[in-house]
């Protein structure tokens, strides 16, 4: 039997609120609400992101989404997906805060900030993101900005008061894994707020890799929702997140160019007494 590590003391804290799970999930791209609920339960996550515009407009696949989950047990992370400008993102963030309040989370000021004018690669706009973040912080939001893995932008967003930074591993939904490891390492090294790797993770080994880099948490949606068995993939991602976190805390051995024997090299069969 494999021993299950006790991770209860290792909490993730964002804007003064603590969470036991370091895996966040989404609500999009599932084949049914039943699959979504089963996957969220299997993941053990406590934060679930919701696209405000799609819920507000009852976009296909999002009808009744706000009522499909028990928001007494899950912390809502409204997101500004679909916003191409800072102005749009600010308006949608305000709607998201009201939506959270209507669903019983009166003190929820969280927003996942996405400003994405690029419809092909879905890469975030750094200038628009910074502009929107500055305004939303002034309005009392806990801003979790989705960004390219740009260490200077990450630091600037931290300086204006963002609650986290969320660098992408690779483009949204691409399943390409972690394509910017060096920059994520720099962001982790410099950040004084949680670093959440968001987008591009396709399977559990990539989730573990992101956590081994020192990320504080992950946000994974497509890899779970579009898996052949979403609930099983959600469980795999949860376990990988924990494994990667433990490995980072444990500290990996240094990489070397030559082998180092794990057993003593003295007293080998065939050695003369003089060399033993």
From Swiss-Prot:
Chief location bin: cytoplasm
Cellular compartments annotated: Cytoplasm
Keyword Oxidoreductase attributed: no
UniProt keyword annotation of Transferase present: yes
GO CC aspect terms: cytoplasm
Pfam families reported for this sequence: ThiG
Binding site for 1-deoxy-D-xylulose 5-phosphate: 173, 199-200, 221-222
GO biological processes: thiamine diphosphate biosynthetic process
Catalytic activity: [ThiS sulfur-carrier protein]-C-terminal-Gly-aminoethanethioate + 2-iminoacetate + 1-deoxy-D-xylulose 5-phosphate = [ThiS sulfur-carrier protein]-C-terminal Gly-Gly + 2-[(2R,5Z)-2-carboxy-4-methylthiazol-5(2H)-ylidene]ethyl phosphate + 2 H2O + H(+)
Pathway assigned in UniProt: Cofactor biosynthesis; thiamine diphosphate biosynthesis
Disulfide linkage: none
GO molecular function: thiazole synthase activity
Active site location: 112
Keywords: Cytoplasm, Schiff base, Thiamine biosynthesis, Transferase
Domain of life: Bacteria
Enzyme Commission code: 2.8.1.10
Function of the protein: Catalyzes the rearrangement of 1-deoxy-D-xylulose 5-phosphate (DXP) to produce the thiazole phosphate moiety of thiamine. Sulfur is provided by the thiocarboxylate moiety of the carrier protein ThiS. In vitro, sulfur can be provided by H(2)S.
Subunit structure: Homotetramer. Forms heterodimers with either ThiH or ThiS.
Family: Belongs to the ThiG family.
Record's protein name: Thiazole synthase
Highest classification ranks of the organism: Bacteria, Bacillati, Cyanobacteriota, Cyanophyceae, Synechococcales
């Amino acid at each position: 039997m494999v021993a299950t590590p006790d991770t209860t003391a290792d909490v993730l804290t964002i804007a003064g609120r603590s969470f036991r799970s370091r895996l966040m999930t989404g609500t999009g791209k599932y084949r049914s609400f039943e699959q979504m609920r089963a996957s969220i339960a299997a993941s053990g996550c406590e934060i679930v992101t919701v696209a405000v515009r799609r819920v507000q407009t009852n976009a296909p696949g999002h009808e009744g989404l706000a009522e499909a989950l028990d928001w007494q047990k899950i912390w809502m992370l409204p997101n500004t997906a679909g916003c191409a400008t800072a102005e749009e993102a600010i308006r949608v963030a305000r709607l998201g805060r009201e939506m959270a309040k209507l669903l019983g989370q009166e003190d929820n000021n969280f927003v996942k900030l996405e400003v994405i004018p690029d419809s092909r690669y879905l890469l975030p706009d750094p200038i628009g993101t910074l502009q929107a973040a500055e305004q939303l912080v002034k309005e009392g939001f806990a801003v979790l900005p989705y960004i390219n893995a740009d260490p200077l932008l990450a630091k600037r967003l931290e300086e204006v008061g963002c609650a986290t930074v969320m660098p992408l591993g690779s483009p949204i939904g691409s399943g390409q894994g972690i394509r910017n490891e060096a920059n994520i390492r720099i962001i982790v090294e410099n950040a004084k707020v949680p670093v959440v790797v968001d987008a591009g993770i396709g399977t559990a080994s990539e989730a573990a890799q992101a956590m081994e880099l020192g990320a504080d948490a992950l946000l994974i949606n497509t890899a779970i929702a579009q898996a052949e068995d979403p609930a099983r993939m959600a469980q795999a991602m949860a376990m990988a997140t924990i494994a990667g976190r433990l490995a980072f805390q444990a500290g990996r051995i240094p990489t070397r160019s030559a082998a180092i024997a794990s057993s003593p090299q003295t007293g080998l069969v065939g050695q003369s007494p003089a060399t033993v």
